[in-house]
Amino acid sequence: MFKKLTLTLAAFCAAGIFAAEKAAIAYPGYSLEADKGGLVIKDGSGSRLLKIGRQLFSWAPPVAYPETVTQIAPDTLKVDYRIDKDKSGQVALSATFRATPEGTIFADYELTAPEGMKTGGIMQELQPIGVKKLPELFKSGLWTRDDNGGVPYEVRDGYFRGFQGKRASVWLQLGGNANYTSSWAEHLSYKKNESGKQSASCVFQLTPPGTTGAEAAALLRNRPLTLTLATGKPFNLWDSGVPEFTVNITNPGSQTQSGVELAVTARDYDGRSVLNEKRLLTLAPHQSETLKFQLPEAERMIWFAEASVKQGGKELLFTRTSLAVLPPHEFQDRENSRFGMSAYFPVPDMESVYKLMRRIGVRILRHGDNRECAKYGLLALDHANVPKAQDPSKDKARLDQILKRAMEFENPEIEFCNEWNMGLKPEFHRKYAERYAKLLRQFRQLCKERNSDIRIIGMGIAGDDPKFVRALAAAGAWEYFDGGIAMHPGRGNFTPDYEKNQWSYLGSIRRFKKVMGELGEKSIHLSEVYAATHANDWWKDSERQAAENVVLTYALGLAEGVASIQFYQLHDAVWHDIGGVNHKDSEYSYGLLRRDGAVKPSLLAYAAVAEQLDGAKFRKYLTFNDLHVKGVGFDTPRGPLAVVYDRTDGMVQSKKAPDFIHLEPWVDHWKTHREVTLPAISDEVTVIDSIGRATQVKAVDGKVTLTLSGAPLMVYGLQF
């Protein structure tokens, strides 16, 4: 707290800015001063915290050294840099640093560089002196209401790097690629400006020691409060008992916040309001309040919680999460399971992730280390890519690297390369198919030399793409696919049983199988199947649609006899931005879990369908007198299982529209719900919904009446 630094915001504002003999900006709580080789940030006692030094071009020879520091305004320093290793003689760099009484320092850089010089890798030297650089970024997302009334979503608020000290800390709002980092530098992203030069920026924030990332983000963004929901449980998941969560509200600033209206609500999957509480709070400077809330006990359920804050009747901010109960379950036929996971991240940690995947019924991993994951009953394959346009002289080293890892990780099969056909024009099919076949021959020879019996799964084909698949066979690749071939049946705004569109799930599988019949049967691995939940995107699922579509994805995949069905992916976000947020990019929304690991309905659906298809054998597709009723029949150790649903409302989930919105996950989106009478083999049938909740329905005279919609039900006790 700034009080601990012997100042408050009021003291800040009352203090005058002064310039020392050397260029400096000083406030009672901190100062920014010229220092040999750059600028230094000091705390109120004069202790050095962080030095801002050189800029290294990294991808080009020049290095920029701070040479002169000039005070151009009471609150602004200008730095001019000396450029070394500049053969062009055309590189120039200057920067301004504006420091405010609130502890914020705005750094703006302007670069002149000749055309062709690589400036994309420039790193700003930041030397921790009286602070320790935190290893984890704080990736701030700001929950936002949709202008059209759709579901709320997170917007990227900024990524923040912390430098924690005993008496003060410094937080940096990154101005570049968060992955370009080291113990002493951070990346700056230079972009061309209107003058033809290049600009970059970043922002520093002085804070009290112990300030969290959320509090630092609020200070940098001039928000008076922070608001977080937490459970302390991995994935916000319970196996029994009463779920509970905390709401933390903090005033990170130096002014009292009064009249703070806190509202906390929660709904279950059926739309019932199970929590609706309000508090009126006053928060002194740096005060934090944590409130605890409980949800009803349930055997299996998911809830959606929201906390919001208003002042003067205006909403300042809100946040959301989801919580669930998923009871324990042991799978009986794990060895033969075809349920897989295409990608996953260590959020919150790998042990928790492995345990979760075991619980929900995952058997096959697209990649992983069997020395670790085998302990959890998981079988890791390998997946590796060689860029299709890579310089062939680099192929041998890359192939050697791929095989070495697969042997070390004890992977029995490897999916060799990925989606070379994506966006590939037909006239290039032959060229790259022949390159791929050559790589396969090289890789197989390398396997022989290393005494490796690893099987090759042909590259994951984007969609069914029969022309490219035929080109692979013509080039001689087919004989090497002793592990089968992979395919990614991308699915648009259709239910999984739709067949007509190129980007339809069942349609892609059946078209792919037809090509297999022409070229020679190979086992098919669906190494990426999808139920993305990009908010208010007409091409993607809502969270409720995703849960329903996960059930059908696996039921239909098993019915079609594929070797594995690997869901893409466990977590939201992307591999190069784990835990990140980017509302503009749908790639961040493919998970069964939210970016922070919180459970989505689709995770419960994955567990539900895995439980019911444990040990199942496909019997037949079901037909009924009512042509709108569809079904898939399986024999299971628990008896005959029918996955049934109604298609009165069709298979197209949405229409393209600029103002398209998704419904909330607790809202049933099907227009038609019909009572349908079906033949039964017992006096009672068991009906299991998309998230795994079971109910018993009485049958009379060998018939049972079920209420059907487009949402699939898994039913034991039907005659077929």
Residue ranges and their predicted role:
Residues 19-80, 100, 150-162, 166-167:
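Beta-strand-rich N-terminal accessory domains
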Residues 21-23, 101, 106-176, 234:
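Polysaccharide-binding surfaces and accessory modules of carbohydrate-active proteins
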Residues 51-60, 84, 153-227, 267-269, ...:
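Beta-strand-rich recognition/accessory modules
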Residues 55-116, 184, 207-213:
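Extended, loop-rich substrate-binding clefts of extracytoplasmic carbohydrate-active enzymes
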Residues 198-215, 696-720:
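C-terminal beta-strand-rich structural cap/linker in extracellular carbohydrate-active enzymes
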Residues 246-250, 255-258, 623-681, 711-714:
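Carbohydrate-binding surface patches
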Residues 433-554, 560:
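Noncatalytic carbohydrate-binding groove/subsite architecture in carbohydrate-active enzymes
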Residues 531-606, 621-627:
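Aromatic/acidic polysaccharide-binding cleft in carbohydrate-active enzymes
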